[in-house]
């Protein structure tokens, strides 16, 4: 079975870090091995490919901690140690169109990431038959991707199993399902399903909880073609926490070698 995980990097980062850092000071749960996230929590046969959509923070903001670009590049380097992972980059644009003079230029907008994610999923689903995914994981809580899910479920040439992964427990799977069903009914009015007479499989929606994330961390000691490097201190979780949460000792991120 060909499986593909599509990750909205911005949505994952803010979903995990804002929820867990505010709740328990556990922003380090965002130091994620995305391949392990699927293989350990949703195991199945076949090779898994991961496509990660992000943007370099080229636009500096006055209220952000200095060194954001360097932190991004370190994370980008860590990402590349994950097997079968492709990074697709968009860009940031300063938000200078706001009418409020006090906030103008103090925010930035990520451009092309959402569109690139949707286009990539469509290109894969409608591509050569031997390359089409049979199971798609979408790691994003962005409701703007619901029409894409609809296209995968109702319009793709071959049925595709879809699993939506919501980045944090701040979101409810039932709420997403309800919103998707409303979107689906609306879209069916103008875009009839190519499988209208076939009972399609429902969209599976799973919330990434603390145990899933803690069991899917990148190692803190990494190596690539440029040499060895480590997870920075601000991403590391306390040893006592890892003792409690890592249900398999081999999955601990603080083990060297």
Predicted feature residues:
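Nuclease catalytic cores that cleave nucleic-acid phosphodiester bonds
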Residues: 87-257
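Domain-level signal for Mg2+-assisted phosphodiester chemistry and nucleotide/NA-binding surfaces
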Residues: 1-111, 155, 160-168
